[in-house]
């Protein structure tokens, strides 16, 4: 944080400092979160936030865009190089905005879509009733096999043949296994549907070849630019050349006005970082840490949905321990371990309570955690969840967590912020 903010707006500075301390003093296991580099933070905090740039490079509705054109072109070219995509739009403000624009590019209100059920690991924007996607379109859902808890591709095929959707959506927010995009494209082709892949969670894995890529398989690919990509918070659409014009028009002027050029600069920086060999090493460590976390929790007696993980996240089923996800989230937060409650397939509890928690390794891998730290973390989670009301257990774990994280700084956070005076807010 710019120290001058303390003079300009003490209340906001205090809130930001509080968050700096919280991030520094906790083990961050929310699967959708990560820590950006100081370079990304610098780009997002730059003077580019002052510039309006409606339109696209070379075709703006405002003057003075020659510099921001360079930034957007860099982001586009780096994304194309990283993913091998024919066309890229880097303007969506978020993953949800990217999905809405992708729908807007190829669908009309009332068209039929087929997406993964939110209760089985899908995402709100894949047709959930509470989302615009569930109000604009006629929606059907597929899910996981009740025994294996993996996507049942034969069932997807049968549903698709029955309802004949115009669009099939692949991708998930809480699915710990590899997604077979090629099989889904076969299903889409069989029923005359377009295939869209939402790779928001696995984009970093896809970028380095550690998860099968949907590029060249799905006609439309959407993603966020944070999560496993470690960039600024935003969205991106990649597509076949035949959909390029429709996608660009769907983003602007279809669903957005001016792009956030400072955020696009952050995307460009992160995409450049992802092109370096060190990024593949990082993703390899993310996957190794997830496997170790999963194996240790299983050894401690916890059941994992689908029996493990192939990617950066895992789902822990808490039913046999008599805990709701909500309580597990709360008691772990009390000891400095941040997770989120999450429904599991066929969950008997409502989403506000949930029967599981979702864990992910991208953030702490960025801070330098390796297998040894993940084993410790898993054992602490087990200790707390086996005795959620035992204050002595929580006090011990809280102290051990604090000592461990003090050795693994958050990128871009100063020593003073990490060890500053405790005001009781964290």
Swiss-Prot record:
The modification N6-(pyridoxal phosphate)lysine is found at residue 227. It is found in: Cytoplasm. Its main location: cytoplasm. Coiled coil: none annotated. GO terms for cellular component: cytosol. The record marks 226 as: Plays an important role in substrate specificity. SUPFAM superfamilies: PLP-dependent transferases. Its cofactor is pyridoxal 5'-phosphate. It catalyses: (6R)-5,10-methylene-5,6,7,8-tetrahydrofolate + glycine + H2O = (6S)-5,6,7,8-tetrahydrofolate + L-serine. InterPro entries: PyrdxlP-dep_Trfase, PyrdxlP-dep_Trfase_major, PyrdxlP-dep_Trfase_small, Ser_HO-MeTrfase, Ser_HO-MeTrfase-like, SHMT-like_dom. Signal peptide: none annotated. The keyword Acetylation does not apply. One of its GO terms (molecular function) is glycine hydroxymethyltransferase activity. NCBIfam families: PRK00011.1 (NF000586). This is Serine hydroxymethyltransferase. It comes from Thermomicrobium roseum (strain ATCC 27502 / DSM 5159 / P-2). The gene is glyA.
